[in-house]
Amino acid sequence: MTQIFHSMIAAILGISEKQIGQTLSLLDDGATIPFISRYRKEMTGGLDEVQIESIRTHYEKLKETAKRKETIVATIREQGKMTPELQKRIDDTWDSTALEDIYLPYKPKRKTRAEAARQKGLEPLATLLMLQREPHPEQRAAAFVKGDVKDADDALKGARDIIAEQVSENERARNMLRNTFARQALLTAKVIKGKEEEGAKYRDYFDCSEPLKRCSSHRLLAIRRAEAEGLLKVSISLNDEECVERLERQFVQSNNACGKQVAEAVQDAYKRLLKPSIETEFAAQSKERADDEAIRVFAENLRQLLLASPLGQKRVMGIDPGFRTGCKVVCLDAQGNLLHNENIYPHPPVNQSKEAFAKLQKMIEAYKVEAIAVGNGTASRETEDFLKRQTFNREVQIFIVSEQGASIYSASKIARDEFPEYDVTVRGAVSIARRLMDPLAELVKIDPKSIGVGQYQHDVDQTKLKKSLDQTVENCVNLVGVNLNTASSHLLTYISGLGPQLAQNIVNYRAENGAFASRKELMKVPRMGAKAFEQCAGFLRIPNAGNPLDNTAVHPESYHIVEQMAKDLGCSVAELIADKELRRKIQPERYLSPTVGMPTLKDILQELEKPGRDPRGPIKVFEFDKNVRTIDDLRIGMELPGIVGNITNFGAFVDIGIKENGLIHLSQLAQKYVSNPNEIVSIHQQVRVKVLSVDTERKRIQLTMIGVSG
């Protein structure tokens, strides 16, 4: 069975069976996706995280189908209806829909009209009608009038119920109807009378009809949400007459009285059984496709957000701005530890701008502040302006930082554990400052669904969503790597091979014994076994370690290779890392072995070139247009700087410094055809846009990147 799975997955993904087998073997052995992708390239043929995840997903689906087959076979055997031909059909079928069609006639049912008719002894009459040879079925039906069967008409009705069920369970009929649905089904939405005002935000769908196959995921999810809120009536429709006609061509063989009885049964089968069944099936399938697309978009947005450029280890002031309640100010050291907090009131109604400046000046001097992070919520622009009007004694850079999810973090157990003696306002300001220093380390503390980059995230399959987002966070954390001596337990949790318990054990060990001096010391951590060490070691960094390789992505299992390279060149490992000319003399082919191939050697050489390199780019200072404060300040044709805040499959939302974000539709991202917005823009990218239209009533702003100067 395993080999069959390998062949099927290989055919679906276009990856060799050997790669599939090796990858699944590693996964079964407990290896994580980041570990396999980074350190087992020879075994997988260089597959990336997405390919490995896809292999795992397909394998799990096939195992589920195999388990379902076992249940189906057991049920049919219990009924004594299994035949060699039926067994072969089940064995050969791996499509879940086709499998359920095979099983349908044997599936135990609640008491249906057909089952009730069978219990009245009407199945022989149904068989007689289906033969369509009897010229006077009413006369033959009279023989079945007994017990609960009142008269011949009642007998014929029961027989038609049996035929209707047989028609609805016929594989050919179901497939015909599926094909018709796939080609012709229309998704129709209409506003429920009296709900026009309440459902104003769904105005685009008040009277819409479009082919289901062309309905984009975001439109489908929006329509389904409006339906769930009781604002729209939604249906899937198609040409009923054509469908019934095609069914009659299949089942009605004679133009006689029996044929008319069968035709009546076919019409009933379509209306009462087949159409609702296939409609439900298509609704579920289209919802699943929309969910998968929305989850894919969310995961990609999250990946980009987590990999946003960090300011790094600098002394930062964080400001959570506000008007009446003032601005909460915190000062952090280069490691993100809280040194000081207080409030300032530079804005109305208090207007203590002079006092606010004096306090800021004092804090900047006292804590040697190098940068200021301002939250992008209420009073953000006013606070930014206030800061830029001041002349401080030290040079400080000012950054606007997304507050999305900061309030969730500030009230969370993680925040309470970190700052038990401070209130939520202090914790929120600390989170804003830390997001500037290292977005990844801070954002992993927040449920990704609270970060605000999802598309209809509450409407999609929550189990699938969580699995995808957790894997995305894990991939990002391991791509960057973490400092073993400063990482929080929450960040360590996402490191390959660790999890919550080992992560906490590492933090506890650090607290009791001081900083780790080497990766080897990890083996002293309670419950750290050889397997966990193998999986995690390469992703944990120790700056200033005795062995410089402990601060690189070179895995300890490969240290001997680097040591041999250094020995062959007559130098130390540290000298090899420091001297470009020495590295140029390395001949990688000399270090090939049955277990170490060129992919691993190339990775090692890249690490020696830039030890512990951070894949995230340098951070850039950004300024919004000073003349734009509200949506009323916008004019068509106006060009503005902006920051991409969210990406969907229909375009990108851009923060232009006001309360409302503007949308760059897919068609307005570039002169060329764009199928995926991520080809053009990414989360946090700084862009220049032009205003196309402004709808102040609905708070909608349309933007373009086409024909923009500079």
Q: Could you say what each language-model-derived stretch is?
A:
Residues Q51-S54, K61, T65-G318, R324-Y422, ...:
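Duplex nucleic acid-engaging cores and interfaces of nucleic-acid transaction enzymes
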Residues F144-K146, K150-A152, C208, L247-N256, ...:
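Low-complexity, acidic/Ser/Thr- and charged residue-rich accessory regions of DNA metabolism proteins
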Residues N179-L187, I319-F323, G377-E382, V401-I408, ...:
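A glycine-rich phosphate-binding loop feature that marks nucleotide/adenosyl-phosphate handling sites
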